[in-house]
């Protein structure tokens, strides 16, 4: 009655609220949905909500953010998942599950009638099972438990290629990035390695915080060349297949340097490392050139404890 007295039509207000709810975008919907799911499921670990939010913000919002929840289709979900389904199967699988939960919440709130992120009778017709993806990736990504033995054993070797491989693992960098590392790119005092844009896949300069273990590798390297890891019998760059050959000889398996980056990424995921830090550590820059230009902070200092923790995990201090 008070609203009528104030000149407000309650029926009109109710209609406006319903219209606003019906037209809600994914970007406006998902924070509240995550909060509701958190409360209903009584999550005890606050990091679960942070991880959900981080994953959704990184992978889903750029594509789904401005779409109305009711307009999102299976095709939109596939656009989100396909780019990472084989490259980051663990992340992709978790993301799909989280999206399915969010859209189930949307159904419960009567925003939609069908769930575009369901697996059975839905996405399963367009994406291979994660188990099959893992079978392929298993041959290239060394499991963490094996890496915990491989890294310390590699540290005992004295060849240039063994040091290059270990440095690459500790810094989670690509083969062409660490094989061509030069001494003038490395600041020992600041424990920072600056890779020039010309050698980066993303075309942007990348600063890498160096852990104690990574610095120890550099201390054992001879400075006979401008290159940190020159070819054994020359001052030229090492053959790009040298690390793979070394790993195969040492393990008898077809593990690759790229696989170590996958192992690092899975470790980040399992330890609730914020998505932005993990992606920056791997020099995965999102968005077009304009978006990249506005991402001024490379989170160097925030990444420093991350890389030290990674190094301590695979090469713990001797007691």
Regions found by a protein language model. Give the residues of each.
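Extended, non-catalytic subsegments within catalytic or DNA/protein-binding/adaptor domains
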Residues: 23-26, 54, 65, 70, ...
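Active-site/catalytic core of tyrosine-dependent DNA strand-transfer enzymes
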Residues: 141-148, 190, 199, 209-259, ...
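Short, polar N-cap/turn motifs at the start of nucleic acid-interacting alpha helices
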Residues: 185-192, 254, 273-293, 316-319
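Basic/aromatic-enriched alpha-helical hairpins
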Residues: 5-12, 22-86, 102-105
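Basic, Lys/Arg- and aromatic-enriched nucleic-acid-binding interface segment
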Residues: 19, 40, 84-100, 108-175, ...
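Hydrophobic (often cysteine-bearing) scaffold residues that line and stabilize catalytic clefts
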Residues: 22, 26, 30, 45-48, ...
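Catalytic-site neighborhood detector that most strongly recognizes the C-terminal catalytic loop/helix
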Residues: 194-203, 215, 234-235, 282-316
């Amino acid at each position: 009655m008070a609203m009528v007295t104030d000149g407000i039509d309650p029926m009109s207000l109710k209609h406006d609220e319903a219209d606003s709810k019906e037209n809600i975008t994914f970007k406006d919907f998902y924070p509240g949905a995550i909060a509701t799911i958190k409360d209903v499921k009584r999550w005890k670990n606050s990091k679960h909500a942070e991880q959900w939010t981080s994953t959704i913000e990184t992978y889903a919002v750029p594509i789904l953010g401005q779409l109305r929840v009711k307009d999102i289709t299976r095709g939109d979900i596939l656009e989100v998942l396909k780019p990472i389904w084989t490259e980051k199967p663990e992340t992709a699988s978790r993301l799909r599950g989280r999206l399915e939960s969010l859209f189930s919440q949307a159904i419960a709130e009567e925003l939609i009638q069908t769930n575009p992120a369901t697996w059975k009778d839905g996405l399963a017709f367009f994406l291979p099972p994660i188990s099959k993806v893992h079978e392929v990736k298993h041959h290239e990504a060394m499991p963490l438990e094996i890496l915990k033995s491989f890294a310390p054993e590699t540290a005992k070797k004295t060849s240039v290629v063994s040091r290059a491989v270990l440095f690459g693992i500790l810094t989670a960098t690509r083969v062409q990035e660490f094989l061509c590392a030069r001494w003038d790119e490395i600041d020992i005092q600041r424990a920072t390695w600056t890779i020039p844009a010309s050698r980066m896949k993303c075309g942007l300069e990348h600063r890498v915080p160096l852990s104690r273990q990574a610095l120890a590798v550099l201390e054992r390297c001879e400075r006979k060349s401008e290159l940190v890891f020159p070819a054994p019998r020359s001052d030229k760059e090492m053959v790009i297949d040298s690390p793979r050959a070394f790993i195969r000889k040492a393990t008898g398996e077809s593990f690759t340097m790229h696989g170590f980056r996958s192992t690092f990424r899975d470790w980040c995921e399992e330890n609730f490392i914020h998505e932005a830090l993990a992606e920056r550590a791997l020099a995965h820059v999102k968005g077009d050139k304009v978006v990249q230009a506005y991402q001024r902070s490379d989170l160097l200092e925030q990444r420093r404890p991350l890389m030290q923790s990674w190094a301590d995990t695979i090469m713990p201090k001797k007691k």
